[in-house]
Amino acid sequence: MTAKTPLHTTHLACGAKMVDFHGWDMPLHYGSQLNEHHAVRNDAGMFDVSHMTIVDILGAGGRQFLRKLLTNDVDQITHNGKALYSCMCNEHGGIIDDLIVYQRASDNYRVVLNSATRQNDVAWIRAKSEGFAVGLQERRELSMLAVQGPNAIAKTLSILAPAHVDAVSTLTPFECVDVDHWFFARTGYTGEDGLEIIVPNEFITQLWNDLLNAGVTPCGLGARDTLRLEAGMLLYGQDMDETTTPLESGLAWTVKWEPEDRGFIGMGALVSQKQQGIKRKMVGLTLLDKGIMRHGQKVIIEGCPDGIITSGSYSPTLQQSIALARVPVETGEQVLVDIRGKLIPAKVGKPRFIKQGKPV
C-alpha cells in the first residue's frame, strides 16, 4: 500500500496525475509539466515534498557527531540558522545519501534526507550515533512545502503572518529560521531562489491554499526533475549511490579534507581515491541533433570505455535534450550517445546548464 502525504486529497482536487514514487502516491503533474516548469523559472511554483525524511539530531554532541557522519564539515557553520549541503558516505566512500543539515541551535540540528532511502538512512544514523551525546527524532508529524522561483519569496511573504514575514524577509541563501513551530529555509532543488517550509501536518493544507490564492502554481515530480536536471542537481539512486563516490559525481566540493584528524566516515577511502586519481567523472551533455537522452543510455567515447547517462531529458528552458553522464576522465569535448541504436553526437560540458533561469 502506498503512503500518502497530508496533501493527498488536495492534489486530487487540483487535478493531479498521481504516480508511485518509492512507495509514496505523489503528483507527477497537474495537467502540464511544461507549464509547471516555466512557472518556476519565470514566476513561482510549489511542490509537496512531505515525503522527504526529516530527522532532528538533539544534544550537546550534535556537532561532534555530524563532523564524523558527513563529508562536509559542520564546523563551517559559524552561527545558528545556517545550512550546509553534504554527502553521507560509507566506509568505502560510497554515497549513502546526499542531504542538507540545518543548525537551529548549538544542540539542535535538522537533516532532510531523501524519501527512497528513509529506512537505510535512519538506521545508519542511529547506529553511528552510539557513543555520542545525541538523540534522534524522526519528525513524521511534519509536512514540507517547497516554494520556488524568482517571485516565490515575495508571494510567500504576502500570505504569512507578520511575525513570520519579519523573520523570513531577512533570510539569505542557505539560512533558516524557526518561528512559532514553523521552519523556513532559503534552500531548494530547482536552481531558483525560494523557500522550503516545514510545518505541523495540520497547517499544511491551509498553507497550500493560501499560496494557491496568491498565484503560486502547483507543480509535480515531472517539473521538479527537469528543473533540477537543468540546474545540475543530482538525484540519489540515479546519478549516484553507494557504488559511486563524491569525487566521481562532481561533488568533491562537499568533501572537506582538513583537519586531517577529523576522520569522517569514508575519509580514508576518499583520500586514497584522490591520491590515485579518479577514473570516472560527471559531465553535462547537450545533444547536437534530434532525440532525447535518457537514463541508462550508453555514451560512446573514442578510445575509451563506454560512459553512461545517469539523468537525461528535454530541457524546456534550452529547448534541447540535456543529460548528466558518468564518463571516463579522459573524455574530450564531444561524444556519441546511443539512442535506440542510433549514435547521436553530443557536446560535453560542465554538469550544470541553467543558473537562476539563464544558460550557463
Curated annotation (Swiss-Prot):
One annotated GO biological process: glycine decarboxylation via glycine cleavage system
Catalytic activity: N(6)-[(R)-S(8)-aminomethyldihydrolipoyl]-L-lysyl-[protein] + (6S)-5,6,7,8-tetrahydrofolate = N(6)-[(R)-dihydrolipoyl]-L-lysyl-[protein] + (6R)-5,10-methylene-5,6,7,8-tetrahydrofolate + NH4(+)
InterPro entries listed in its UniProt record: GCS_T (IPR006223), GCS_T_bac (IPR022903), GCST_C (IPR013977), GCV_T_N (IPR006222), GcvT/YgfZ/DmdA (IPR028896), GcvT/YgfZ_C (IPR029043), TrmE/GcvT_dom1 (IPR027266)
A GO MF label: aminomethyltransferase activity
Keyword set includes Transferase: yes
Span of the signal peptide: none
Keywords tagged on the record: Aminotransferase, Transferase
Keyword Hydrolase: no
Top-level taxon of the source organism: Bacteria
GO cellular component terms given for this protein: cytosol; glycine cleavage complex
Family to which the UniProt record says this protein belongs: Belongs to the GcvT family.
Assembly and interaction partners: The glycine cleavage system is composed of four proteins: P, T, L and H.
Its job: The glycine cleavage system catalyzes the degradation of glycine.
Protein name: Aminomethyltransferase
Native source species: Legionella pneumophila (strain Corby)
Gene: gcvT
